[in-house]
Regions:
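Helix N-terminus capping/helix-initiation residues
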Residues: 1, 113, 267-269
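Glycine-rich beta-alpha loop elements in corrinoid/cobalamin-binding modules
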Residues: 1-8, 219, 223
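Radical SAM [4Fe-4S] cluster-binding motif and immediate context
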Residues: 9-182, 193
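Radical SAM enzyme core and accessory elements
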Residues: 20-21, 27, 225-351
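Flexible glycine/acidic-rich beta-alpha junction loops that bind and position SAM and/or redox cofactors
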Residues: 43, 91, 143, 147-148, ...
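Short, well-ordered loop/turn and helix-capping segments at boundaries between secondary-structure elements
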Residues: 76, 102, 150, 194-201, ...
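Structural recognition of alpha->loop->beta junctions
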Residues: 127-132, 194-215
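Short alpha-helix in the alpha/beta-hydrolase fold that links the catalytic acid
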Residues: 188-191
């Protein structure tokens, strides 16, 4: 029984729910757990390692039994829908959403395409218990979206996010990715511009722009087109042993700059500057658009509360062993020792 409780935690320790006032209503069951409504994804993004082929949905009758059990026996009142691709099957999604609402669940979805929703969908979701939707956008550059084969436009991103914000649905920190083949100073600036536009639309207070965005560097995952591209360039190993070593090293690292493999072709002095350029351009774009607007002080307090919650979550700040600092083109970066040795040996070759 004690082990089972590890799968649940109080809602006020989860950032997906504390931004919504409905979470604090009297009588609501306090525990949160994750569920799946579907498996797989309809997209074929070139950087994404697919956990399952195809796309399938969970049986609705079994889903209802499961939700009822969670409520009655585990005091659950909040659900995190952990699908890769929430909402692609519209008819099924509406039925599943109605089921969650039937059992008085507040819920959030952590993986949704901007092309999978309309404003009418968002209103339906909110009215049936949705508190938060996390979109996978990856870039503000149409060039890079096309390289990633995201199959949507930058305007689709704005349309979905602005609709969420306008009807009061929270959208957690957006994920931006740098370093795919074709990335450049120009495309990095385009991502920064979009980041600033979104922040200005929300009237996010100065200093919180970057807390609303995750900015990561591409890691080539085995089985993806970008991994095969890296192999063709000779960056992932010339032999089976070298490839095995690469996989061993990268199997448990995050998508951060310190682990980036430069299959882009840009000079490393430019590569290490991309993330800073994104933030600089985001600030410039934000300040320009906010000239005649007032910061949203209520939203500021909500983000402060959210940050306090994230600080309590042991998964947010994963500890790394054997950290040291090395200098890469003038940028001091904290790097795991085996990764740093591999990085310096194989990729920092620029004169």
């Amino acid at each position: 029984e004690k082990a089972v409780q590890n799968y649940f935690r109080p809602f006020d320790k989860h950032e997906a729910f504390i931004m919504d006032e409905r979470s604090f209503e009297k009588g609501r069951r306090p525990m949160v757990t994750s569920i799946f409504l579907s498996k797989g994804c309809v997209a074929k993004c070139t950087f994404c390692q697919r956990g399952a082929k195809g796309y399938s949905v969970y049986d609705l009758s079994k889903l209802e039994t499961y939700i009822k059990d969670l409520k009655d026996n585990y005091n659950v009142g909040f659900l995190v829908v952990a699908d890769e691709n929430f909402g692609s099957n519209k008819k099924y999604t509406y039925q599943a959403v109605e089921l969650m609402h039937k059992y008085d669940m507040l819920w959030a979805a952590t993986g949704i395409r901007v092309s999978s929703v309309t404003k009418e969908d968002l209103l339906f979701y909110k009215n049936n218990g949705c508190t938060s939707l996390k979109f996978g956008i990856e870039s503000g550059s149409q060039t890079m979206l096309d390289v990633m084969e995201k199959k949507f436009q930058v305007e689709d991103i704005k349309k979905a996010l602005f609709a969420c914000h306008d009807i009061g649905l929270n959208s957690p920190p957006l994920g931006f990715m740098l370093g795919m083949p074709g990335e450049s100073l120009k495309t990095a600036k385009e991502s920064g511009k979009l980041m600033g536009e979104i922040a200005a639309h929300l009237k996010i207070p100065t200093g919180l722009i970057f807390k609303h965005n995750d900015l990561l560097y591409t890691i080539p995952l085995i089985g993806t087109p970008v991994y095969e591209y890296g192999k063709q360039l000779g960056l992932i190993g010339q032999s089976t042993d070298e490839e095995e070593k690469f996989l061993e090293i990268t199997s448990n690292v995050g998508a951060f700059k310190r682990y980036y493999i430069n299959f882009n072709g840009a000079p490393m002095s430019e590569v290490v500057f991309w993330d800073m350029l994104v933030f600089l351009e985001a600030t410039r774009s934000y300040e320009k658009l906010m000239k005649n607007k007032t910061e949203n002080k209520e939203l500021k307090q909500k983000y402060i509360n959210q940050n306090n919650v994230q600080a309590l979550n042991p998964h947010v700040k994963a500890k790394q062993n054997k950290i040291r600092k090395i200098e890469v083109m003038g940028a001091v970066t904290e790097i795991n020792v085996p990764i740093s040795q591999y990085f310096v040996t194989n990729f920092v070759k620029e004169n």
